[in-house]
């Protein structure tokens, strides 16, 4: 949600997007995902083809274009551009680029300040991998970017493609907590001496309990698929 909110140019967003959300409840959950190591704003086009298999066919998240708009009853031109490929060139000229970590940081800090910092910033992964720089830096640059954003808890997706050693090295400099309930060590990994987190042989903690504004909040990690 935080990433989608950054799709507009400052001139458009300053007059057309209201970020003055009234606080409710004990805390605020802020979620970002799939920034793919893109630190600068960029043009992004949703796919015009997505094929679900079996019972997932023609079901979210495997519906696109007009089917998606009809399924969720979306008639906003802005959301149409954010979530589909329809009339991309036309709307891209109007709304500008997506994302950008400076934009994200500004928005996240605003959303936190509205609730006296009683908030958790969650990251669904696909964050540390995806750019030429992150490839050269083995994702370390993006770990540092995550720390600057103030990510509290994240799970993984393409972060694992750097390999076990680099991934674990990156976790050492990550200031947040990494959780993944669906990743366990294989017999081969155990034989080679890699230590599991618990008796169920989890690679990392499956969940974590955070105490925010007097409330206990459980965050369960679900790595790919369906992060």
Residue ranges with predicted function:
Residues 4-227:
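N-terminal catalytic scaffold of extracellular/periplasmic and nuclease hydrolases
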């Amino acid at each position: 949600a935080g990433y989608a909110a950054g799709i507009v140019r400052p001139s458009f967003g300053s007059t057309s997007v209201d970020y003055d959300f009234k606080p409710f409840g004990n805390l605020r959950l802020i979620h970002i995902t799939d920034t793919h190591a893109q630190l600068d704003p960029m043009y992004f086009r949703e796919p015009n083809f997505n094929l679900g298999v079996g019972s997932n066919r023609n079901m979210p998240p495997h519906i696109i274009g007009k089917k998606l708009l009809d399924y969720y009853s979306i008639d906003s031109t802005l959301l149409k551009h954010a979530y589909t490929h329809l009339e991309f060139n036309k709307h891209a000229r109007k709304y500008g680029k997506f994302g950008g970590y400076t934009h994200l940081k500004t928005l996240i800090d605003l959303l936190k300040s509205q609730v006296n910092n009683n908030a958790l910033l969650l990251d669904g992964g696909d964050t540390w991998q995806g750019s030429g720089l992150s490839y050269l830096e083995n994702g370390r640059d993006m770990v540092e970017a995550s720390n600057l954003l103030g990510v509290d808890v994240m799970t993984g997706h393409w972060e694992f493609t750097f390999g076990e050693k680099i991934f674990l090295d990156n976790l050492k400099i990550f200031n947040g907590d990494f959780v993944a309930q669906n990743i366990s060590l294989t017999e081969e990994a155990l034989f080679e001496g890699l230590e599991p987190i618990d008796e169920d042989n989890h690679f990392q903690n499956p969940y974590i309990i955070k105490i925010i504004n007097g409330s206990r909040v459980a965050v369960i990690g679900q790595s790919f698929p369906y992060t």
